[in-house]
Amino acid sequence: MPHHRASSGQDHLRAGWEQRLERSLPAPRVGLLWMGLGLALVLALFDSTVLWVPARAYPLPSEGHSVKFSAIAPPLQSAFGWQNLTCPACKVLFTALNHGLKKEPNVARVGSVAIKICKMLNIAPLDVCQSAVHLFEDDVVEVWTRSVLSPSEACGLLLGSSCGHWDIFSTWNISLPSVPKPPPKPPSPPAPGAPVSRVLFLTDLHWDHEYLEGTDPYCADPLCCRRGSGWPPNSQKGAGFWGEYSKCDLPLRTLESLLKGLGPAGPFEMVYWTGDIPAHDVWQQSRQDQLRALTTITDLVRKFLGPVPVYPAVGNHESTPVNGFPPPFIKGNQSSQWLYEAMAKAWEPWLPADALHTLRIGGFYALTPRPGLRLISLNMNFCSRENFWLLINSTDPAGQLQWLVEELQAAENRGDKVHIIGHIPPGHCLKSWSWNYYKIIARYENTLAGQFFGHTHVDEFEIFYDEETLSRPLAVAFLAPSATTFINLNPGYRVYQIDGNYPGSSHVVLDHETYILNLTQANAAGGTPSWKRLYRARETYGLPDAMPASWHNLVYRMRDDEQLFQTFWFLYHKGHPPSEPCGTPCRLATLCAQLSARADSPALCRHLMPNGSLPDANRLWSRPLLC
């Protein structure tokens, strides 16, 4: 059983955090209503777009087949014409929306215009446009009456710096304690025969209760393989029984199969579960739908894992509208209390009272799962580029990072180690949030023993470096692959081997394993689901250990070794990579992502370039990393 003991001074920490939270309510600002709904609509539907081109299953790279990093334009175009939103069109669109502010339109009128724009730009089918607008309009109008964004800033946000400059998310800094940073002290390897624990890691389950075998996997909607997707042409097969290689999520039976088949991968000391429970039908989700997904999957996890403690984190798909996580100063029906209260009720058997307290307020918590280890679960939606509520005030929402500093300082004072779990990886966050988090990790490198995230659906990592030289690797965040097939992937899960539960344990990651369900085999006539280990990290990559320096060295080995990179690329996609080859620009962009635990930091990739040139690294950074 977990120990869940309170840390000394924890009541003081909580009181200080709550006082800062009460002072954080921002003053309202004049808003841009029409622009807001258009922007949120595009961001929401973009969240469900196809990021990988459908492809047939590919053999292992050792069999001589190359694979490719697919460009972002074709899959987005096939989803709903996102490519139609060019920079000039974007600026015309948002200028027109801005002009409408002078008439102070009501919510219904704003929604009507947004639907017409969605249809005109072919962003999605008309029924999807209508449902998405009606779902988002009330919250977005509220946000945009409190915030301000020009057409140039909006298009810079959507299409990148080449289309406009935006700095609405102003720079801010977290205060670190005056306690001097101890000299860096890498953990000592465990003694031979020391206990090793296995931690199950689940992320991005995305249960679709509308999944229906035989339906069209390539429908016009953002999510297919479900009632309403229609039936495929006679020449094309329909959605498989256990899942499908397309823009589809999972039926409940596949998640039951995953949990039921965990035996060979265990036993587990504990489970880290980093969110995204509902499906990608973001245009038609109600609060009842989200709560149904939360309770159904929580009950399923508890049924199959029994007494094993489970520690969840909040994903960006838990809310509706998707990505909509208002900071705690937003009260009433538009707050996230409906969700946090439901999570606290569902997860109460796993979490102590003090963790439930902060979960109810801000969706994050800390606890002690075993002696000498503190677990911190972050609500990474407060760092998200897609969380439109942060347009009101993006400065350390909910005071979460300052609270994190206090938790880490208390752990350092006690001599404890810390694991951090969350959904969105720090390298994918808003710049100021990401840079502050990076600074915090650097300060507490001796205390941090592991960081674990999901969200990207693929198998990767992010390395942290010292801030002075950006050359000494000091931490690594592991980004585990998804359970869902979305998009064009095998279902999967991760198991971490960590230094075991004994006095003096370093609690660091020693190795990890990834397990998948091969859909081609499972969906074959008479096929049954068989979850098998895809690979072990240290064995496959030839790593001496799982420390940050080993992952750093792996990146540069993959830069120079094509075959090693192709192995990584195959595993990155859970054994089902895109069909086209991944050339040098693709390889460098992918490797750059592994070096980039800090957002908008091209200098982190400068050594990937042949001459170490920063301008070349800047061009590399501008490439889409997950397409």
Curated annotation (Swiss-Prot):
Signal peptide: 1-44
EC top class, as a word: hydrolase
SMART domains: SapB
Modified residues (Phosphoserine): 506
Effect upon mutating residue 280 to A: Complete loss of activity
EC number annotated for this UniProt entry: 3.1.4.12, 3.1.4.3
Regulation of its function: Hydrolysis of liposomal sphingomyelin is stimulated by incorporation of diacylglycerol (DAG), ceramide and free fatty acids into the liposomal membranes. Phosphatidylcholine hydrolysis is inhibited by incorporation of cholesterol, ceramide, DAG, monoacylglycerol and fatty acids.
List of residues binding Zn(2+) 1: 204, 206, 276, 457
Misc remark: There are two types of sphingomyelinases: ASM (acid), and NSM (neutral).
Function: Converts sphingomyelin to ceramide. Exists as two enzymatic forms that arise from alternative trafficking of a single protein precursor, one that is targeted to the endolysosomal compartment, whereas the other is released extracellularly. However, in response to various forms of stress, lysosomal exocytosis may represent a major source of the secretory form.
Subunit structure: Monomer. Interacts with SORT1; the interaction is required for SMPD1 targeting to lysosomes.
Protein's recorded name: Sphingomyelin phosphodiesterase
Organism: Mus musculus (Mouse)
